[in-house]
């Protein structure tokens, strides 16, 4: 077995770190700018969601998303590729929405909003806030737009790279043409469930919106190595024999090798988001008591992103019908997860985060239903 250690840091700087450095440099000329934040747009769902921020005053808003078409003022900016200045927030912004109420509570006095546009595509917004009224004169606006180009490029490039990695891995999976491999909506549910858990974890885990977005993007790749497992084992409609289970468990190392090859091809092996991707693929079958595979990691050795995906994967397997089992109710599935916590296998915070979001979990289970196609054997 190839040795593989959890990656807790990489040499490249995260987008959050880059934004904080950009803010630090900006303060030399504009000391009144107390907050920079970027929200990204997901076109298929019309969702605008918080992503990265550098906040010197007030409390950062995190885990917030809204339909762009439900915010006419921002929709106008996106459609017309225009920036916007609010010279007096207290006079021009009225409460009533989560974001407006939050903005008024922070004590910011003026703001400047710049759309992120690349290749004529709207990707999101940069929000710049000041502790002074009338901070953003026309000349300052022009300067900030030019300066923001670098951070906008960084965001656009990283999002493009992340989506390219996912698309490449998905293409490999499709080319393999494995009948029933992760059929139906399993991968969509994995992304949604993993994000749900990550968003509801206690603050001490330190997950940023940037981290959560990467977990959302990369959790569907957790079992990518299964494309190297023979169909007779992958699609077996019953319990695996010991020898079959050993072969099934090699999908983890196969997945790591595959993703490392893709990362190397795109020169992304040191990218910050590569850490989360590799940890998910390598460690999503590890249990906290050391009884998992293939590395037998224990406790804190298992990265939080892997613990999240493990809980999401088991929950999804329990709540959906498979050739070898009937579907369980959400309530019974959560009971099973809690029992696995008591056995020392699963992270208590991750299971609690899911249990505390019962309605959202139920919505994911019922909204993304499987077809009648068979799914791969999880090999647990």
Give the location of each predicted region.
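Short regulatory/linker helices and ligand/cofactor-binding micro-motifs at input modules
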Residues: 1-17, 21-25, 171-184, 198-200
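GAF sensory/regulatory domain recognition
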Residues: 24-27, 35-66, 72-74, 220, ...
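Regulatory sensory and allosteric helical modules in signal-transduction proteins
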Residues: 58-98, 104
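A short, aliphatic-rich beta-strand micro-motif
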Residues: 109-117
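Short beta-strand-to-loop transition segments that serve as allosteric relay/switch motifs
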Residues: 124-135
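Amphipathic alpha-helical "output/dimerization" segments
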Residues: 135-156, 213, 304
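Short alpha-helical interdomain "coupling" segment at the junction between an upstream regulatory sensor module
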Residues: 139, 154-171, 267
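Histidine- and acidic-residue-rich, metal-dependent catalytic cores
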Residues: 167-380
